[in-house]
Amino acid sequence: MIDTHAHLQGLDGGADAAVERASAAGLERIVCVGADVGAAREAIALAERHAGVFATVGLHPHSAEQWSDEVAAELAELATHPHVVAIGECGLDYFRDHASRAAQARAFVGQVALAERTGKALVVHSREAADDTLAVLREARCRVVLHCFSLPDHLDEAVERGWWCSFAGNVTYPKAPDLQEAARRVPHELLLLETDCPYLTPVPHRGTPNRPERVLDTLAFVAELRGCAAAELATIVERNADRVFGL
């Protein structure tokens, strides 16, 4: 099984220990997210040390004020590393508004362009910004992963456009029936699973820091939603990750 979105850099005990613990629990691969230049460098270094770890490079919307020609060039250089499989996470977050919306838009559009130039997948963060996120993505010419899927009202469009929908631990929460219905309905070829650790810990571990191996809890939950065996769904998710990230 694979965790397609993890922030290993901030986990208690260190990233290397987290990878080893996940491997012991049966998790074979992890996509470690670089949400700014420093985190991207750490993700690449971790991928160099562990055969089952892959990296993304990008600038999170919370940090979008950092976007500049220099940062864009640095991310482009990092994206050439053989262990880098995607650009992001990037996108729009109007819930927190840690950066101005204009800065978020510039950084998002710049990273879409980088994904298009490199041929790598684009990992998208969207929170309380559906309309503006979709307006950008409709013009994008790259593979799109809707990280921590938050657009259940737009599932049909996502499917029509061939965007991958990645569900995190919050799909297991009792007050998430819309996400659960989306996870049940999305075609198997567009389904991914992730932890977004250390955030969004799934039931029954909610209230503690999330870890990569807990994607297995989300896997079991979504498999039950879809009426299939967890092992069958794991194979589907791994195959989809291979396709979208070129693993």
Question: Regions from the language model: what does each represent?
Answer:
Residues M1-L247:
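Mid-domain alpha/beta scaffold segments of enzyme catalytic cores
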